[in-house]
UniProtKB/Swiss-Prot annotation:
The keyword Phosphoprotein applies. It comes from the Eukaryota. One of its GO terms (cellular component) is cytoplasm. SMART domains: WD40 (SM00320). The modification Phosphoserine is found at residues 935, 1456. This is WD repeat-containing protein 7. WD repeats lie at residues 17-56, 62-104, 156-199, 324-366, 404-443, 462-507, 558-597, 1351-1390, 1392-1432. Residues 936-945 have a biased composition (Polar residues). GO terms for biological process: hematopoietic progenitor cell differentiation. Residues 761-783, 911-945 are annotated as: Disordered. Residues 768-782 have a biased composition (Basic and acidic residues). The gene is WDR7.
Length: 1490
């Protein structure tokens, strides 16, 4: 899914808990979470309460093979990170608090054990992971980036390591790694902090190698209590060794011929050893094993038989002898919480966790009686105890009489074009149902609960037993008929269905086993094969079934082993089949002949050579874990391809690919705001359905449909401003004329979209209807079966209704809840909704049902939450208290959607959805019933205008139609519409600013600043605005102390840029020589393998990797992302809360120095401003760095830099080259008009248009924040430019310079300044006039006059224009008058007054110029020369001026001190060629005659 899409999963688990055959167990350091990995590749997080009660919280998807080991990966108490490894060599770093995957990698080797090791370098703590497995060394991996740093290697008899332990030495700085190889040789490596910090790949050899004759070693553990003993457990005996010289102290055989699988020290004198059938034994060690006793080592050297310790102390047994598929996994942990528990945790193949608390029993002198289990729970039990039961997607349609279990769904496919979900069930029936409607039934309460068999659906019956797979070929390739749906079952048959009529078209019975997979051949196969689908069955056969000819054109059935992979060589007409034994069969498709069968390396090469690998995950047939990664690369993600707007990398291979080249192109939008993906954790499980909501696509769809509604509201300025996404302070830049053009374009694109995507709304042209009828034979209409349009409803609004109802925090504000239910039409959830979280590389965490129920019976004063949610218990409270990442995503989604709905006309979910034909927006042909009347938008000052104001209410035909019956039809629609918008506004405000207070800080998990920072310039304007509002609200909420913490946390990641900022004029080659190493390579640093993943934007592109030099320049994704985030976060804090921001001349309350964050102080007064300088350097670097593949011209990070430079210009100004920055911004918006002219309503802007828009906004902000800086800088550039232009050599490229191309933009900003900051403009009026003269075409001014070309400047009384000889007079602050001659482009200055000039005016015949200054109270008359040559302007002679008269005038008093009236004190009006009136602002007149 595109780099930055905001995609939220909601999961419907169904009543049967997923299979979870546990293969690894871990207890986190804080003792609050148990982590289990299973053989199918999922990881489950279980909450453990202080009373040792367990509640399953989430299931993490991402591994494609069985989990082999788990380890903690972080030692700090605030971060709970774990690392997992699977059989296929994948390693993932997870955040336990919310299930996010932080980093992942894939190695060519399988780890069987990982140990975390932390050491200190100076004052920094570094984490390392020591991994061992099916390879003859120990790999040392960085715990944050998962990069392999170096390895510990054996010189003597290298072999696989079976287990390993780290011995920490408190006396010396050296730590020891002790490992046992498979052959029973003990290896010792010494690891020092110097070695650990080394970055080279030199291996480290062992210090010691000693055979200790321990075969089949299962575990090795170091005694933390005595710091002297080692326990080695082998399958048939266990032994204790002295850690000093590895001499044997004691040994114990296995009990009753059982096999030991592990052990650990319970205390200094007790060990616990467990067997493979789940029993555990505690032994008391003899005194000779205890360093504290006098007889320590007294038995060394005796025969092994004499070293057997006393009989076992306590026997622990499982209470119920369940039959298990494989041995349970047992581990011993001692927690370090307030209650110091020693826990034995065991997980088994049925997904059950058992816990024994050993602390209290270790002291009892007991005999062999069993110790009772403290707690035991399985996933299925956790599901069963919930009321209501966890819902499946079509439970209400799958009720079996006299059974409380519904029919299981065994195969599913979603058809996004129709919004239909097709579910195959275990009884052979197939149900087609509208996905949003059936999800609403399962998740939300409403009138649908009273109807049986709701929503209307269709059932196809044809298979005799379970349906195993479904395929909708048209979705994969448009070459297939869109009516056809293909199903395969356990009855060996493949059936073609017509989904429109519901009839069975054909049955293929060619296989001799159940159908396991249905595939689509690639595009470039032969014409005959193109109309086939490929079916794979469990009798090891593959068929090509032609949908056109209705026959099997080829059956390949000689394979001896199960089929693992199907590949294609269309060019050679080959079908390549890979089997589970490694053999490969090559079949000719046309003839059906077996071309060859090969094994070994040739087989591998053949498979690799098939370029056209059909994206069936390599082992999807043999391995049951159809996890998200595979789903994402298979048809299911041909399904999700719709969400993956324009970048879907091959996640199956985890290759990090860069598609920087794409970034400039406008992404292709699919319009699927909802995707339904069925996943199975195990082949035997029923389907779990995950609904993926793509927030951006949903917003686009809502706006697109809104734009297609033919009401004049579209042209209202409010909406246009919305369209331009202008959060600009400068007004809308779309004028009425362009709006009409835009409206036309919008209608065209909308028509296309609606035709394409809303077929079920039967709102199509007659042509489509006719076509549809022809396609679907006469019986299509006559047959009694309903057509596919089972229920007519608005798919987009339904999706929004479902999503918003699930996200809203119910029960916190009763008044708002009422508004949501009655006015907005949202529905309350039945029970807590299980959301998910997508993270990097298609990894996903899904909340298990009941995740928010406390695992404890009664702890910390929490009362047991009723299983049924009482009305008061807010369902939404659950999601905002889960984790910070979840809160961030949910708040972003709900605020951006609420803002979108608010900008629409009467966007309420109350409609006639439940009835058959709903009221529809009028067709384009129907005239609008009443023209929209806009009333001024009501303003709410929440979050200083960051939350959008309620849009002006607009009447449309639809608002009457949509009235729910409760209102009298006469109630004015205008009012309803206004109330609806106000409702959305309140909803957005509550989630943006009031949640922490309503929920209480103990429950509320605040949003993550860094996640919001990364969306500061999100591609989707609504999400961008929501992120900015949320981030600013959160920064305000945490107040100064919190902001200081954020700065301290992120400042170390801020890249240290060099001071040479590259001006746009400098070529990139020159730039490279200016910069200093190592930063020169910075922006190029490995951004190549940038990965556009599901969660974060390409904000990392182009960030330097130059963290403090003692660390190696890490190029890991996370590191680069942190740098980008640091720049944005510090930029926002600096810009919004930085040094005193006081716009000149406008008296605002100066910020008290205590409010300024440390590091962002003013340059004066000795305050600390280092951070402001570094942040400013980073921002200007990103703006001015020439475009390169590593930092594309319109990347998100560059756009963010533009935005922040504009926002915080007053903070950054002292440290930046203002001229370079302004020119850089002008360069970006030189073509803004062109870019922004062709935007389509609702769709995100193209990256180029977005950059132009941001640059334009930044320029307006800079100009209004510091008008003098802007005016003087641009005037200086203009002078420099004109001087260059005079130099003939550089003439040819003058018109291509930035300044020349951005003339329109400069004029736009000057106009804003004249409008908003007239006083500043008057102070520098001559410079402003210089800029205007440069930007306006001389010929145009001559033809039309200044008044028409640039009316704004003519408002000033100190500017006068004489049309006949094209002269402009401008009065300056220091008493001089500048005279411009437009024909020659020359300027001449005359000095005549001591103070600022108040007014100037040319006489009607142009012979005289009158100037007046209020300060020195003089009016002067100047005579223009009347010589013939001068008047013709020959010889470029400047006009001769002389002062012919000066009069004294009593001064005019301003109306009120300090007001703008100072600019309008008096004006000069010529009544004839010789008479002039000085008109004061209060109406007094003084007449003068020349």
């Amino acid at each position: 899914m595109a780099g930055n899409s905001l995609v939220l999963p909601i999961v419907l688990w169904g009543r049967k808990a997923p299979t979870h055959c546990i293969s690894a167990v871990l207890l986190t350091d804080d003792g609050a979470t148990i982590v289990t990995g299973c053989h199918d590749g999922q990881i489950c997080l279980w909450d453990l309460s202080v009373e040792l009660q367990i509640n399953p919280r989430a299931l993490l998807f991402g591994h494609t093979a069985s989990i082999t080991c788990l380890s903690k990966a972080c030692a700090s108490s605030d971060k709970q990170y774990i690392v997992s490894a699977s059989e296929s060599g994948e390693m993932c770093l997870w955040d336990v608090s919310d299930g996010r995957c932080i980093e992942f990698t894939k190695l060519a080797c399988t780890h069987t054990g990982i140990q975390f090791y932390q050491f200190s370098v100076g004052n920094q703590r570094e984490g390392r992971l020591l991994c061992h497995g099916h390879y003859p060394e120990i790999l040392v991996v960085d715990a944050t980036s998962l990069e392999v740093l170096y390895s510990l290697v054996s010189k003597i008899s290298p072999d696989w390591i079976s287990s390993m332990s780290i011995i920490r030495s408190h006396r010396t700085q050296e730590d020891t790694v002790v490992a046992l190889s498979v052959t029973g040789i003990l290896k010792v490596w010494i690891v020092t902090s110097e070695i650990s910090d080394m970055q080279d790949t030199e291996p480290i050899f062992e210090e010691e190698s000693k055979p200790i004759y321990c075969q089949n070693c299962q575990s090795i553990s170091f005694c933390a209590f005595t710091q002297r003993s080692l326990l080695v457990v082998c399958s048939k005996y266990w032994r204790v060794f002295d850690a000093g010289d590895y001499s044997l102290l004691c040994s114990g055989p296995s009990e009753n011929g059982q096999t030991w699988t592990g052990g650990d020290f319970v205390s200094s004198d007790k060990v616990i050893i467990w067997t493979e059938n789940g029993q555990s034994y505690i032994y008391k060690l003899p005194a000779s094993c205890l360093p504290a006793s006098d007889s320590f080592r007294s038995d060394v050297g005796k025969a092994v038989e004499n070293l057997i310790p006393p009989v076992q102390h306590i026997l622990l047994d499982r209470k119920d002898k369940e039959l298990l598929i494989c041995p349970p996994v047992t581990r011993f942990f001692y927690g370090c919480r307030e209650y110091f528990h020693k826990l034995l945790i065991q997980g088994d193949s049925s997904g059950r966790l058992n816990i024994w608390n050993i602390s209290d029993t270790a002291d009892k002198q007991g005999s062999e009686e069993g110790l009772a289990m403290t707690t035991s729970i399985s996933l299925q039990e956790a599901f069963d105890k919930l009321n209501p039961c966890p819902a499946g997607i079509i439970d209400q349609l799958s009720v079996i009489p006299n059974s409380n279990e519904p029919l299981k769904v065994t195969a599913s496919v979603y058809i996004p074009a129709h919004g239909r979900l097709v579910c195959g069930r275990e009884d052979g029936s197939i149900v087609i149902v509208p996905a949003t409607q059936t999800a609403i039934v399962q998740l939300l309460q409403g009138e649908h609960m009273l109807r049986r068999g709701w929503p209307p659906h269709r059932t196809l019956r044809g298979h005799r037993n379970k349906v195993t797979c479904l395929l909708y070929p048209h979705q994969v390739s448009a070459r297939y008929d869109q009516r056809y749906l293909i199903s395969g079952g356990v009855d060996f048959s493949v059936i073609i269905w017509d989904i429109f009529s519901g009839e069975m078209k054909h049955i293929f019975c060619v296989h001799g086993g159940e159908i396991t997979q249905l595939l689509v051949p690639p595009e470039n196969c032969s014409a005959r094969v193109q109309h086939c689908i490929c079916s794979v069955a469990s009798d090891h056969s593959v068929g090509l079934l032609s949908l056109r000819e209705k026959k099997c054109i080829m059956l390949a059935s000689r394979h001896l082993f199960p089929i693992q992979v199907i590949k294609w060589r269309p060019s050679d007409d080959y079908l390549v089949v890979g089997c589970s034994d490694g053999s490969v069969y090559v079949w000719q498709m046309d003839t059906g002949a077996l071309d060859r069968c090969v094994m070994g390396i040739t087989a591998v090469e053949i498979l690799n050579a098939c370029d056209e690998a059909v994206p069936a995950a390599v082992d999807s047939l043999s391995h049951p874990a159809v996890n998200l990664k595979q789903a994402m690369t298979r048809r299911s993600l041909a399904a999700l391809k719709n969400m993956a707007h324009h970048k879907l990398q091959t996640l199956a291979t985890n290759l990090l690919a860069s598609e920087a080249s794409d970034k400039g192109n406008l992404p292709k939008y699919s319009h699927n705001s909802l995707m339904v993906q069925a996943i199975k954790t195990n082949l035997t499980d029923p389907d779990i359905h995950v609904l993926f909501f793509d927030v951006e696509a949903l917003i686009i769809q809502l706006l697109t449909e809104e734009a297609s509604r033919p009401n004049t509201a579209l042209i209202s300025p409010e909406n246009l401003q919305k369209a331009s996404g202008s959060s600009d302070k400068g007004g809308s830049f779309l004028t009425g004329k362009r709006a009409a053009v835009l409206f036309q374009q919008v209608k065209e694109t909308i028509k296309e979209n609606i035709k394409e995507h809303l077929l079920d709304d039967e709102e199509e042209d007659e042509e489509i209807m006719r076509q549809r009828r022809e396609e679907s034979d006469p019986e299509y209409r006559s047959s009694k079966s309903k057509p596919l349009t089972l229920l007519e409803y608005n798919l987009t609004m339904d999706t929004a209704k479902l999503f918003m109802s699930c996200l809203h925090a119910w029960g916190l504000n009763e008044v708002l809840d009422e508004v949501c239910l009655d006015r907005l039409g949202m529905l309350k959830p039945h029970c807590t909704v299980s959301f998910g979280l997508l993270s990097r590389g298609g990894h996903m965490s899904l909340m298990l049902p009941g995740y928010n129920q406390p695992a404890c019976k009664l702890s910390h004063g929490k009362t047991e939450v009723g299983r049924k949610l009482p009305a008061s218990e807010g369902v939404g409270k659950g999601t905002y208290g889960v984790s910070r990442a979840v809160t961030t995503q949910h708040l972003l989604s709900i605020i951006s959607l609420a803002n979108t709905l608010m900008s629409m006309t009467n966007a309420t979910f109350i409609g006639d959805h439940m009835k058959k034909g709903p009221t529809r927006p009028p067709r384009p042909s129907t005239p609008d019933l009443s023209k929209a009347r806009g009333s001024p938008p009501t303003s709410s000052n929440i979050v200083q205008g960051q939350i959008k104001q309620v849009a002006a209410p607009v009447v449309s035909a639809r608002s009457d139609a949509d009235h729910s019956g409760s209102d009298p039809p006469s109630a004015p629609a205008l009012h309803t519409c206004f109330l609806v918008n106000e409702g959305w506004s309140q909803l957005a405000a509550m989630h943006c600013v009031m949640l922490p207070d309503l929920l209480g800080l103990d429950k509320f998990r605040p949003p993550l600043l860094e996640m919001l920072a990364r969306r500061w310039q999100d591609r989707c304007l609504e999400v961008r605005e929501a992120a900015q509002a949320l981030l600013l609200a959160e920064l305000r909420r945490i107040e100064q102390a919190g902001r200081k913490e954020a700065i301290d946390a992120w400042a170390p990641y801020l890249p240290q840029y060099i001071d040479h900022v590259i001006s746009p004029g400098v070529t990139s080659e020159a730039a490279q020589t200016i910069t200093t190493a190592p930063d020169a390579s910075g922006p190029e640093a490995k951004v190549q393998e940038e990965e556009h993943d599901l969660v974060d934007d390409d904000i990392t592109t182009g960030c330097l990797s130059s963290v403090p030099q003692m660390k190696k320049i890490s190029t890991s994704y996370e590191e680069r992302r942190k740098q980008a985030t640091a720049i944005v976060l510090l930029g926002v804090i600096g810009a919004e809360f930085g040094a005193e921001i006081e716009p000149p001349k406008l008296l605002t309350r100066p910020r008290s120095s205590s409010q300024i964050p440390e590091g962002f102080g003013l340059t004066s007064g000795g305050s600390n401003y280092s951070l402001a300088r570094h942040t400013c350097k980073a921002l200007t670097f990103l703006l001015l760095q020439p475009p390169s593949p590593k930092l594309p011209p319109h990347s998100t990070i560059r756009r963010t830099a533009i935005d922040l430079i504009g926002r915080g210009f007053t903070v950054w100004e002292p440290y930046m080259d203002v001229s370079a920055v302004l020119m850089g911004l002008l360069e970006l918006c030189a073509d803004a008009e062109k870019q922004l002219a062709n935007i389509t309503m609702g769709l995100p802007l193209s990256p180029a248009a977005d950059s132009a828009r941001s640059a334009r906004h930044a320029l307006s902000l800079i100009a209004t924040a510091r008008p003098p800086a802007f005016i003087t800088t641009i005037a200086k550039e203009v002078h420099r430019h004109t001087a260059l232009a005079a130099n003939t050599q550089s003439q040819q490229n003058m018109h291509t310079t930035t300044l020349a191309r951005a003339k329109g933009e400069i004029l736009r900003v000057i106009e804003i300044l004249i409008e908003k900051m007239p006083t500043d403009v008057v102070d520098l009026l001559v410079e402003v006039m210089d800029i205007i003269m440069y930007c306006l075409e001389g010929s145009l001014v001559k033809k039309k006059g200044l008044q028409e070309c640039f009316p704004a400047i003519c408002r000033f009384y100190m500017v006068s224009y004489y049309e006949r000889n094209h002269r402009i007079a401008v009065g300056a602050r220091h008493g001089s008058v500048a005279l411009y001659d437009i024909r020659t482009g020359k300027c001449q200055t005359i000095h005549g007054h001591k103070g600022p000039i108040t007014a100037v005016a040319f006489a009607p015949d142009g012979r005289y110029l009158a100037t007046y200054s209020n300060t020195d109270s003089h009016i002067s008359f100047w005579q223009m020369n009347t010589s013939l040559l001068g008047s013709i302007g020959m010889l470029n002679s400047a006009p001769q001026l002389r002062c012919i008269k000066t009069y004294q005038v009593p001064p005019v008093q301003p109306a009120s001190p300090g007001s703008h009236n100072a600019l309008k004190l008096a004006r000069l009006i010529w009544t004839s060629n010789r008479n002039v009136i000085l008109m004061a602002h209060d109406g007094k007149e003084h007449r003068f005659m020349v």
